[in-house]
């Protein structure tokens, strides 16, 4: 068996076309979605990622801006910028690029974002809504994973899913989304014993811990769906996933590559949530 490759680049491209059509329809009503991104400091990876978000937003007809603060910016300065964006009626969605410098509390900043503009889905209010099945902004990587699975017509009802990683950014929210689709979910983490035992029984595996080579061919049963969220740069700067891709694709039923799998879907869901934010505040959703 050779796995079906879940091509995040192509799926994202098709999805963005649908978003672009919706943006154009909104513009005809007099509304243009706007995404504002706060970047503190000059981390190369963060700067590159923020620029790619801006470019993607503008490509589908949105307005986007980067609010770039110095590495030495105080917490108060960051919070003041957030307050300005919260109160700016032209801004549909706000996200703060992490990590933040040590003098700025990430939690305090995330909690200061207006929940109605929180397109990353990290505000406690939106996290809470997710867990009681209310409409809300869902964190973008988990949302992108679910769209990949949906696009591939993967039926999750009654399936055994194993999620490796329990972060609030990926592991926990994607587990909740899988449960919403009636999967039976097991979460593994650094204290879990005999991970291979659980992996071998899984119909779906989502690995999101950033440990290259963690999931091997021997861990995966034939026909399983494998979603690799890992993107760790090696000594040459090449991104490596958590999964031994070349080996695992020989037994898996479907698999995401790294890069080009989950990554493009994450940025696409930032755009999706920005559009949703604009629709909701205009009473159109």
UniProtKB/Swiss-Prot annotation:
One annotated GO biological process: L-histidine biosynthetic process
Alphabetically ordered keywords of this record: Amino-acid biosynthesis, Histidine biosynthesis, Hydrolase, Methionine biosynthesis, Multifunctional enzyme, NADP, One-carbon metabolism, Oxidoreductase, Purine biosynthesis
Pfam families for this protein: THF_DHG_CYH, THF_DHG_CYH_C
Coiled coil: none
Catalytic activity from the UniProt record: (6R)-5,10-methylene-5,6,7,8-tetrahydrofolate + NADP(+) = (6R)-5,10-methenyltetrahydrofolate + NADPH; (6R)-5,10-methenyltetrahydrofolate + H2O = (6R)-10-formyltetrahydrofolate + H(+)
Ligand binding (NADP(+)): 165-167, 190
Disulfide bonds: none
Function: Catalyzes the oxidation of 5,10-methylenetetrahydrofolate to 5,10-methenyltetrahydrofolate and then the hydrolysis of 5,10-methenyltetrahydrofolate to 10-formyltetrahydrofolate.
Subunit-structure text: Homodimer.
Protein name in the entry: Bifunctional protein FolD
Recorded name of the encoding gene: folD
């Amino acid at each position: 068996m050779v796995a079906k490759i879940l091509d995040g680049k192509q799926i994202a491209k098709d999805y963005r076309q649908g978003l672009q059509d919706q943006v154009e329809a909104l513009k005809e009503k007099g509304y243009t979605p706007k995404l504002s991104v706060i970047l503190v400091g000059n981390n190369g990876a963060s700067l590159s990622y923020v620029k790619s978000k801006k470019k993607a937003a503008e490509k589908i007809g949105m307005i986007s801006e980067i609010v770039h603060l110095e590495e030495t910016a105080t917490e108060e300065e960051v919070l003041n910028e957030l307050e300005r964006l919260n109160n700016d009626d032209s801004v549909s969605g706000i996200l703060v690029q992490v990590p933040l410098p040590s003098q700025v509390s990430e939690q305090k900043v995330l909690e200061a974002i207006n929940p109605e503009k929180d397109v990353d889905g990290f505000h406690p209010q939106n996290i809470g809504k997710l867990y009681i099945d209310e409409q809300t902004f869902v964190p973008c990587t988990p949302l992108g994973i679910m769209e990949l699975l949906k696009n591939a017509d993967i039926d999750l009802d009654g399936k055994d899913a194993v999620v490796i990683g329990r972060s609030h950014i990926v592991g926990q929210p994607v587990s909740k989304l899988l449960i919403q689709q009636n999967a039976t979910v097991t979460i593994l983490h650094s204290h879990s014993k005999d991970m291979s035992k659980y992996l071998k029984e899984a119909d779906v595996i989502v690995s999101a811990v950033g440990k290259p080579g963690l999931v091997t061919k021997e861990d995966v049963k034939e026909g399983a769906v494998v979603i690799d969220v890992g993107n760790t740069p090696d000594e040459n700067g090449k991104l490596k996933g958590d999964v031994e891709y070349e080996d695992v694709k020989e037994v898996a039923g479907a698999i995401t590559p790294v890069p080009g799998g989950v990554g493009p879907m994450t940025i696409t869901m930032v755009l999706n949530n920005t559009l949703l934010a604009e629709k909701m505040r205009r009473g159109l959703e």
